Amino acid sequence: MTMPIALRNGFATAATDAGYGDDPRFADWPLDEATNQLDWSLIENWLHRSKHDMAVIAKAVIGAAYGESPIYSYFQGTSGGGRDALAQVQQHPEDFDGIWASDPAINWTKLCAADLWPAMVMKESGNPLPPEKLRVFRRAVLEDFPWLDGSIDHHMAPMHPVQFDANKVVGTVTDVGPITERDAEVMNKIWTGPVNRVGKSLWFGLRPGTESWGDNLVQFGIASTKEVNGVLEPEPFVMAVSYFKTWIFRDPNWDWKTLDTETYLDLFEKGVSEFSSRIDTNKTDLSAFSALSHKLLLTQGAADGAIFPDGVVEYYKVLVQENGGLDTTKDFLRFFLSPGDYHSSLEKGPGINVAEGMTALMRWVEEGEAPDSIQISAIDPQSGQVRYIRSLSSVEAMG
């Protein structure tokens, strides 16, 4: 997505399909359907190898074309690309002088399994929540915490979700009937996230106040529903279904509706146990990256409805703790948590645009000026006009 922008601004730029090629499958590509086995060579390409090869080859081509190698090299990625960015930091720290990881899809096993949780809650309760009711819950949260949507000037989003009990909304009238206690129970479970039999949290839930039903530019949400023969049914996120179908069951014909809560929880932990160390891209030892004086810009939308923000917040906290604390990590890391910003800035909330983010990163790498604040802008999705601009402080600047 950023390649045309880079080219228009005079940069040499490169991309890779990671060996995926013209496979028509959107998310089931790791499965070799001829053998019903995972293709680990292709998975290694996806995890890190292809981006490293791209960097090496691109620099050689640039050197041949221009007679000299690039002075500075940068990597920017969002979502899966954000995961790619952190894979470069962790696995190939020498490849890029500056890296921007935005809304990174790390903690892959927990993320994908947890993305199925809202649909599981609605299915198992027999009580899917239509958009009309989800809007009421969100509106109630924003009435109590109006700065969550980013429209009120706020230095940064909180590092933890606000506390809100969905039962406060019970009785509120909507176009599809009043909010019931069952509705509130479903909403609270979605916000809490998956919890195992002994009450241990398996992963985070959606933050209260997050748009989660597809009222955004790409009509995507992990708490979506659809009508089938006049009956409302949960519609799970395709990546979540694919994770179970491909990684867990290795069956392209598997039907998620056959899954009950107990089995889901067992398989959640099984997937983490079996695959986490290989594919989660959450290594926190960045000493090699730091030693090279390379710079990492880590950004996350606090209203992300696809990548649970608290998973990235947790990664950041552990990273800082295990790399000597803020006094050490501030030399190579800045973290920005944007209030009201949806996944990849696909909603109305304010986010860091490519120009602001890359300019800040380049200035840090090339001039030594660390970005303690970055301008964020809210764009009207219909008109493309800027609705407002705010200044977002880094977590480091806020102490």
Residue ranges and their predicted role:
Residues 1-399:
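C-terminal His-loop and adjacent cap/lid subdomain of alpha/beta-hydrolase
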